[in-house]
Structures are given as structure tokens and as C-alpha cells.
């Protein structure tokens, strides 16, 4: 069963996100540092009539990397062609995509860290000098064919920038670190979504919903849909702070944006290991989750909110975690 607070896309959310997707920077809420940098780089590239430098967008899932790629294309006034690392299985697949590009086009590769190395190596000359060399035929009849490519921009998105090879990372001239959203920006996103879908929501309810959305627009929009359902059945359709609190409590999302899995992690650390330190592998076994799942999906938010600290000897529950979970905290803990 999928978590309501899962950062990854669930069900029909890809369609929903396309519906909500802003088209230009003026419509894009939050990520001001990345936007301000990109505005300058895009304007300069347009003045020189050049393709934008290759751009890497990295950060946790659900923060708008794909949306930012489409905004970049719209601001540049060029076409965007979209694919993903896992979808490009062979070097020939990438060659076909590159050969189909027009001058100035943007090639967006989501989950770029999951490309096979043989595919990645094709990108090196394509990104640096706009050409590729491919082998035609097999055995003694094989020959190398040189293909020139039009100037293009590769926009890569990844949740795990550390997994990119150094040669690939070095070829990105622009790096955009997408961070968790601040509460005012997330509240504005909730209000914008409710307006698009013609929901009635009070400012207090929008704030409460944003507060429990883990700094992630994707989660905020998902929770808003579920709260809307609750308001229609249990109320008069209006989402106020009382209805929002009741619905989110029913969904096991507490006031800090933690769900039952987050709480299970903290409870396990406190009850079984005295608050830690405890190794990630040991913790994962105890809560019956994959190590990578804990590391990528749960831990970043718990660390950001100050519930967990990473140390050389393992993970440690903080005083804030003890207080939030209703345990007494002493220095001995």
C-alpha cells in the first residue's frame, strides 16, 4: 500500500501535475535561488542566440524538477523532448533521440543517474562538442560513422546527484539545487491548486495543510485532494482548519508532517536502542523497510526537521524526537 506522504508519483498524479504545471517563471512558486540564476543564464543565452548551457537539477522527489525543465524550455522558446534514464537501455536508443533534435532543443532526462554507463559515455562528446561517433555493422565490416549534432541543451534531473559519474557531472555548466519549500510558498501552492480545481479553502486550512506536507508540493497537492474528499462527505464541501485537521488526522499525518512510518522509525530508535546511535541497516531491518527506502524517503525529512542526527557511529534521535513522541528526554538518552 502506497504512503500518502510518498514523494514519488502515485496513480494518476502525472496527469494532475501536468494540469497544475506552471508555464513560466512568473507562475512558478518557490525555488527563488534557482529561478533567479536561471533567469540570468537564459536571458544571456537568448541575447547571444545560443543554446543554454547543460543544466543539472537535483534534490528530493516532488520538488518540481520536471516542471522547472518545462519552464526553462518555455522561457527559451524552444521544444523539449523528454525521456528518463531507465528508458534509455542501449546506446542506440540515445543516438536515435539525439539525432532527432533540432537546433536549440532541450533534451530532458529524468533520473539521469540511472542511465547505463555505455549510454552515458555517448553523452560526453554530444554534450561537449555536439557530435557522436557510432559503430555501424559488426566484425570486420564494422565502421565508425561521425554524426554532427545541432547545439542543444541537456537538462538532467536526479534525486541522487552523488551517483553521477565525475565526467558526466563536469559537463553540466549550470547546477540547480532544488530544496524543500518554505511554509509561505507551500501555502501559496495549496491556494493556487484549490483555485484551479475550484475548491473552497480558508487561509487557515491552507496553512495547516502546507505545514503537514513535508515541504513538498507533490505531497501538498495529494493531501489537498484527500481533504477535499473528506470535506465533501463529512462537511459542506468547504475546507476549513477544523475539517483539514480531522482529515489529516484520519490519514495519520501529524502536525509535523510525520506519518506512521516516520513515527515507527523514531519509536524504534528510542525504545529499542535508547535513542541511538543505531546503524541504518539495523534500523531498516527492525521496521521492515529496505535500507535505500529509509535513506532516500524517510531520513532526509526527519533530519531536516531535527528529529534525527547522523553521526559517525549511526543515527541518533534528538531531544525534539523524544518530545514529539511523548518520551522523557535526559542527557543520558
Swiss-Prot record:
The family database entries (Gene3D superfamilies) matched by this protein are listed as: 1.10.8.60, P-loop containing nucleotide triphosphate hydrolases, Winged helix-like DNA-binding domain superfamily/Winged helix DNA-binding domain
Which terms under GO biological process does the entry name? DNA recombination; DNA repair
Task: Write the record's keywords in alphabetical order, separated by commas.
Answer: ATP-binding, Cytoplasm, DNA damage, DNA recombination, DNA repair, DNA-binding, Hydrolase, Nucleotide-binding
Q: Where is this region: Presensor-1 beta-hairpin?
A: 130-148
The regions listed as transmembrane in this protein's record are none
Annotated catalysed reactions: ATP + H2O = ADP + phosphate + H(+)
An example Gene Ontology CC term for this record: cytoplasm
Positions annotated to bind DNA = 291, 310, 312, 315
Q: What is known of its domains?
A: Has 3 domains, the large (RuvB-L) and small ATPase (RuvB-S) domains and the C-terminal head (RuvB-H) domain. The head domain binds DNA, while the ATPase domains bind ATP, ADP or are empty depending on the state of the subunit in the translocation cycle. During a single DNA translocation step the structure of each domain remains the same, but their relative positions change. The presensor-1 beta hairpin in RuvB-L binds domain III of RuvA.
Would you tell me the protein name for this molecule? Holliday junction branch migration complex subunit RuvB
Q: Which organism is it from?
A: Streptococcus thermophilus (strain ATCC BAA-250 / LMG 18311)
Q: What is this protein's gene name? A: ruvB
Amino acid at each position: 500500500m502506497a504512503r500518502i506522504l510518498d514523494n514519488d508519483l502515485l496513480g494518476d498524479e502525472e496527469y494532475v501535475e501536468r494540469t497544475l504545471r506552471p508555464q513560466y517563471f512568473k507562475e512558478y512558486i518557490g525555488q527563488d535561488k534557482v529561478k533567479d540564476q536561471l533567469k540570468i543564464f537564459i536571458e544571456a543565452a537568448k541575447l547571444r542566440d545560443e543554446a543554454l548551457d547543460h543544466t543539472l537539477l537535483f534534490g528530493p522527489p516532488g520538488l518540481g524538477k520536471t516542471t522547472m525543465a518545462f519552464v526553462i524550455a518555455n522561457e527559451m522558446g524552444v521544444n523539449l523532448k523528454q525521456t528518463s534514464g531507465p528508458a534509455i537501455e542501449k546506446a542506440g536508443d540515445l543516438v536515435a533521440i539525439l539525432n532527432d533534435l533540432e537546433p536549440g532543443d532541450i533534451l530532458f532526462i529524468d533520473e539521469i543517474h540511472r542511465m547505463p554507463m555505455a549510454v552515458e559515455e555517448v553523452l560526453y562528446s554530444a554534450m561537449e562538442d555536439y557530435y557522436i561517433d557510432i559503430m555501424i555493422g559488426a566484425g570486420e565490416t564494422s565502421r565508425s560513422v561521425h554524426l554532427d549534432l545541432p547545439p542543444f541543451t541537456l537538462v538532467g534531473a536526479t534525486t541522487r546527484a552523488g551517483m553521477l559519474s565525475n565526467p558526466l557531472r563536469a559537463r553540466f555548466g549550470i547546477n540547480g539545487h532544488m530544496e524543500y519549500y518554505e511554509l509561505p510558498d507551500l501555502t501559496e501552492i495549496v491556494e493556487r491548486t484549490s483555485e484551479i480545481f475550484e475548491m473552497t479553502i480558508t487561509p487557515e486550512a491552507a496553512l495547516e495543510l502546507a505545514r503537514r506536507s513535508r515541504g513538498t508540493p507533490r505531497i501538498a497537492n495529494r493531501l489537498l485532494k484527500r481533504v477535499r474528499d473528506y470535506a465533501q462527505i463529512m462537511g459542506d464541501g468547504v475546507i476549513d482548519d477544523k475539517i483539514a485537521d480531522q482529515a489529516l488526522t484520519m490519514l495519520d499525518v501529524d502536525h509535523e508532517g510525520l506519518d506512521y512510518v516516520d513515527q515507527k522509525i523514531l519509536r524504534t530508535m528510542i525504545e529499542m536502542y535508547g535513542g541511538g546511535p543505531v546503524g541504518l541497516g539495523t534500523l531498516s531491518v527492525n521496521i521492515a523497510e529496505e535500507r535505500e527506502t529509509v535513506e532516500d524517503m524517510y531520513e532526509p525529512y526527519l533530519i531536516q526537521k531535527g528529529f534525527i542526527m547522523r553521526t559517525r557511529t549511526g543515527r541518533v534521535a534528538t531531544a525534539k524526537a523524544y518530545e514529539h513522541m511523548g518520551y522523557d528526554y535526559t542527557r543520558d538518552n
